UniProtKB/Swiss-Prot annotation:
Keyword Ribosomal protein part of the UniProt annotation: no
Tissue: Expressed by the venom duct.
Gene Ontology cellular component terms for the protein in this record: extracellular region
Family (UniProt): Belongs to the conotoxin F superfamily.
Species of origin: Conus victoriae
Keywords per UniProt: Disulfide bond, Secreted, Signal
Record's protein name: Conotoxin F_Vc1
Length: 93
């Protein structure tokens, strides 16, 4: 139940997040910086949990994710990563 709620929250977050071209985020805003950093950590953790060999998102510095397009690509890849994680755990005995 909790897993489904987390996945639903991430999907809702992705659907409601404004898609505004290549305009950069303001990294001087502590809330924006924390959100970008937490998203990167979540993607990195999910990739490690799924034993992904090539986790390119962990190599990006937070300044690179200031680009909205790059950050949104990372979040779009997060949903399949979480789906894979939950599916494999659900199938496990």
């Amino acid at each position: 139940m909790q897993r489904g709620a987390v996945l639903l929250g991430v999907v809702a977050f992705l659907a409601l997040w404004p898609q505004a071209g290549a305009e950069p985020y303001n990294l001087n805003d502590p809330d924006v910086r924390a959100m970008i950093n937490d998203g990167r950590k979540l993607m990195d953790t999910c990739a490690k949990a799924n034993h992904y060999i090539a986790d390119r998102w962990s190599t990006y510095r937070i300044e690179y994710l200031e680009d909205k397009g790059l950050y949104h690509r990372m979040l779009r890849e997060l949903v399949p990563c979480l789906n894979n994680f939950l599916r494999t755990r659900q199938e496990a005995p």
